[in-house]
């Protein structure tokens, strides 16, 4: 274990905490972001893009509790396993809260249009296998709440703003913003 910054804490085999006031507790955890704590196994939250668990990730003032999570951004929290919070081309990734397993919140992976990216913020998910991916369409993706499983915020239509969307249910493919999807399999008509 390596604690290499002021007030850093590292406990566990190959645990590393190099961000000020950060901590890595468990096996193979990596934390470089200031004020960020990771508890579990094989989680990563460095401040500079480095290859770790196959991902380039950053995190500041954030926290992870679980296993095999990746975390970017600022003021984000993850509880569970195999969750991904990844900035990609988004101009900001803040205030994301995930509770569950196999959830993804990210910007667009298309770097050819990254100058058109917006901010992703205010996303709250409780459940598993939910996906929120922003498209590079100059629109921010904000204030999305999901309670359920297997839901998708579908931003494939770049003309639509999917902000202010609430889903309470499972197996929903949300295609209209400023909307509430209530019940499993519900849709905008």
Model-derived segments and their meaning:
Residues 1-189:
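Glycine- and small/polar-enriched repetitive beta-structure motifs of secreted/surface proteins
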């Amino acid at each position: 274990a390596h604690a290499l910054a002021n007030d850093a804490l590292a406990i566990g085999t190959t645990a590393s905490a190099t961000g000020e006031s950060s901590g890595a507790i468990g096996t193979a955890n990596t934390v470089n972001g200031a004020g960020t704590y990771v508890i579990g196994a094989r989680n990563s939250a460095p401040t500079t893009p480095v290859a770790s668990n196959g991902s380039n990730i950053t995190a500041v003032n954030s926290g992870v509790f679980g296993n095999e999570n990746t975390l970017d951004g600022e003021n984000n929290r993850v509880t569970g396993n195999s969750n991904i919070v990844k900035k990609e081309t988004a101009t900001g990734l803040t205030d994301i809260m995930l509770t569950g397993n196999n959830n993804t919140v990210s910007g667009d992976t298309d770097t050819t249009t990254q100058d058109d990216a917006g901010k992703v913020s205010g996303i709250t998910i409780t459940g598993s296998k939910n996906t929120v991916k922003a498209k590079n369409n100059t629109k921010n993706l904000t204030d999305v709440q999901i309670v359920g499983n297997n839901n998708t915020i579908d931003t494939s239509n770049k003309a639509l703003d999917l902000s202010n969307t609430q889903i309470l249910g499972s197996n929903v493919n949300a295609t209209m913003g400023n909307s509430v999807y209530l019940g499993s399999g519900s849709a905008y008509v």
